[in-house]
Amino acid sequence: MPGIHDNVIVLDFKSLYPSIIRSFHVDPLALIEGLIEDNAIEGYDGGLFSRDKYILPELIEDLWVARDRAKANSNEVLSQAIKIIMNSFYGVLGTIGCRFFDSRLVSSITKRGHEIIIQSKEYIEDKGYQVIYGDTDSVFVLLGDVKK
């Protein structure tokens, strides 16, 4: 919905791609080949991820805690550096030259992110609001007339 609008809020998912890696165990070590585990986490494009064997989700968890600590200490430089490191995991996994490149890893991140944005849009619209824009990790919601 192009144009300039009043009363719009932006709902931004905090570190969406790192959150997906952490929550859904998207990790080269966790990528299941051969026998399928009963309780595997389903990814996309054939990706299945172990609930027990992984590295990146733990690294991201540690970085997340460190970033929250940096923010609590008003250390914006460190907080931003940690954010860049966390986001770089997705970038590295999506690089063909990376030793751990596998299209199932990146598609399990991007397609899960897309699914989350679409589900959020549907939820918001079911509540009677209009989503006027969405991107990789946020949606813009038109609130309509707001009484002063």
Predicted features by range, described:
Residues 1-148:
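Conserved acidic
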